[in-house]
Amino acid sequence: MSAAVPTTRAGTPPTLQCGWRSACGKLLDIANYVIFSPEASAVVMPVLVAWECVLLKLIVKHVPYTEIDYLAYMEQIWQINNGERDYSKIEGGTGPLVYPAGHVLIHRLLERATDGLQNVARGQDIFTWLYLLTLVLQFGVYRMLRLPPWCIVLACLSKRLHSVYVLRLFNDGWTTLMMVVAVFLLLLAARHPRLCLPAALVYSAAVSIKMNALLYLPGVLVALFLLTRGHLLALALCGAVAVAWQVLVAADFLSTHPAEYFATAFDFRRQFMYRWSVNWQLVGEQVFSHPTFHRCLLLSHIAILMLFFFTRYAAPRQPNWFRTAAAALRHPATAVLAASPPRAHVAYVLLVSNFIGVLFARSLHYQFLAWYHWTLPALLHWARMPCLLALLWYVLHELCWDTYPPSSVASATLYALNSALLLLLYINGPPA
């Protein structure tokens, strides 16, 4: 008689049961690797780029384009092409030209590419490539920061962001591209300090497109100081390069109407429309428009920046800013810091500075999500939230931006979410 195969109580042979357990264990290991291991990003990122290529084509094909600001951009460019150089007289259907000359340079090229409004489909193609190029460069930043794949996936999940790029053709995407390139170069400069100069140039290009890039300015100054190891002459050279670009790109306007250019292109007193404010529907329109409210936001912005500056931004090995500054002033042609900071520290300084500015911005319109959405994967990772809690945070954040028209509940929720994230970023400090 043949021996009977031993079975478990459930009637399953032990060898088969062990096989199932082994297979399940391997699947769990693979899932854990793909979700949490930074090394898996080399596999996840190409898949996400391919997915975005398909998704963007489907969006453009099946969702109608909505005209909001692109016509106004073209009307302003037509006036410039006709010889107008007084910025205070250049207007479009939605108001005056309030963007610096880098915006004009880009949209002159776009006006040719799209033949004004005759070929908006080509413009959508250009903005599709703009989105994808920005995404690939973002992924380069994430790779250097060793973000886990679950964070990286968040960069591709915003319905609002896809709309801003390929269905609205807002200019915010161009500023974001320049800022991502600038951050990318500054992270590389942690090992190759000579890249500080091109980083300063690209940052200046971002500012010349739209002023929101100035939210990064405190972080950029700190990062350049740390990356040049406190070498003040090197820092001054970076500043000179940045200023030179501003003069060069605006030369046509500065040579004829300089006062009008600065007053209009860099108008810090500009009034925003309350009805489109995503972040301040929780206050009344009278409060929103009152100068005292604006001053309170500015003072709060400065106070929080100072808190981070003195307690979180200093060089890891030399935390006393006063001693560092004194040494730099005594020896402006000498590097006074022992070493360049780690890449993660540079990124923390840059991205948190921008996020603080977003939190205290006088208004956030729907397209302004592009200012900081790309930084959320890194910020959520540094906040050290559990994965599921971070995903919940992201979903709620996206719902706030997808609420139309803006509501007081969505505004209050958005402010609470962003405040909680900033608090966690402060508590946990720069990543090691």
Curated annotation (Swiss-Prot):
<dbReference type="GO" id="GO:0005783">
    <property type="term" value="C:endoplasmic reticulum"/>
</dbReference>
<keyword id="KW-1133">Transmembrane helix</keyword>
<keyword id="KW-0472">Membrane</keyword>
<feature type="topological domain" description="Cytoplasmic">
    <location>
        <begin position="146"/>
        <end position="168"/>
    </location>
</feature>
<feature type="transmembrane region" description="Helical">
    <location>
        <begin position="291"/>
        <end position="311"/>
    </location>
</feature>
<feature type="topological domain" description="Cytoplasmic">
    <location>
        <begin position="228"/>
        <end position="230"/>
    </location>
</feature>
<feature type="topological domain" description="Cytoplasmic">
    <location>
        <begin position="397"/>
        <end position="408"/>
    </location>
</feature>
<feature type="transmembrane region" description="Helical">
    <location>
        <begin position="376"/>
        <end position="396"/>
    </location>
</feature>
<dbReference type="GO" id="GO:0005789">
    <property type="term" value="C:endoplasmic reticulum membrane"/>
</dbReference>
<keyword id="KW-0808">Transferase</keyword>
<feature type="topological domain" description="Lumenal">
    <location>
        <begin position="252"/>
        <end position="290"/>
    </location>
</feature>
<keyword id="KW-0812">Transmembrane</keyword>
<feature type="transmembrane region" description="Helical">
    <location>
        <begin position="231"/>
        <end position="251"/>
    </location>
</feature>
<dbReference type="InterPro" id="IPR007873">
    <property type="entry name" value="Glycosyltransferase_ALG3"/>
</dbReference>
<keyword id="KW-0256">Endoplasmic reticulum</keyword>
<feature type="topological domain" description="Lumenal">
    <location>
        <begin position="430"/>
        <end position="432"/>
    </location>
</feature>
<feature type="topological domain" description="Lumenal">
    <location>
        <begin position="365"/>
        <end position="375"/>
    </location>
</feature>
<feature type="topological domain" description="Lumenal">
    <location>
        <begin position="190"/>
        <end position="206"/>
    </location>
</feature>
<dbReference type="GO" id="GO:0006488">
    <property type="term" value="P:dolichol-linked oligosaccharide biosynthetic process"/>
</dbReference>
<feature type="transmembrane region" description="Helical">
    <location>
        <begin position="409"/>
        <end position="429"/>
    </location>
</feature>
<feature type="transmembrane region" description="Helical">
    <location>
        <begin position="344"/>
        <end position="364"/>
    </location>
</feature>
<protein>
    <recommendedName>
        <fullName>Dol-P-Man:Man(5)GlcNAc(2)-PP-Dol alpha-1,3-mannosyltransferase</fullName>
        <ecNumber>2.4.1.258</ecNumber>
    </recommendedName>
</protein>
<feature type="transmembrane region" description="Helical">
    <location>
        <begin position="125"/>
        <end position="145"/>
    </location>
</feature>
<dbReference type="Pfam" id="PF05208">
    <property type="entry name" value="ALG3"/>
</dbReference>
<comment type="function">
    <text>Dol-P-Man:Man(5)GlcNAc(2)-PP-Dol alpha-1,3-mannosyltransferase that operates in the biosynthetic pathway of dolichol-linked oligosaccharides, the glycan precursors employed in protein asparagine (N)-glycosylation. The assembly of dolichol-linked oligosaccharides begins on the cytosolic side of the endoplasmic reticulum membrane and finishes in its lumen. The sequential addition of sugars to dolichol pyrophosphate produces dolichol-linked oligosaccharides containing fourteen sugars, including two GlcNAcs, nine mannoses and three glucoses.</text>
</comment>
<feature type="topological domain" description="Cytoplasmic">
    <location>
        <begin position="312"/>
        <end position="343"/>
    </location>
</feature>
<dbReference type="GO" id="GO:0052925">
    <property type="term" value="F:dol-P-Man:Man(5)GlcNAc(2)-PP-Dol alpha-1,3-mannosyltransferase activity"/>
</dbReference>
<feature type="topological domain" description="Lumenal">
    <location>
        <begin position="1"/>
        <end position="124"/>
    </location>
</feature>
<feature type="transmembrane region" description="Helical">
    <location>
        <begin position="207"/>
        <end position="227"/>
    </location>
</feature>
<dbReference type="GO" id="GO:0006486">
    <property type="term" value="P:protein glycosylation"/>
</dbReference>
<feature type="transmembrane region" description="Helical">
    <location>
        <begin position="169"/>
        <end position="189"/>
    </location>
</feature>
<comment type="similarity">
    <text>Belongs to the glycosyltransferase ALG3 family.</text>
</comment>
<comment type="pathway">
    <text>Protein modification; protein glycosylation.</text>
</comment>
<keyword id="KW-0328">Glycosyltransferase</keyword>
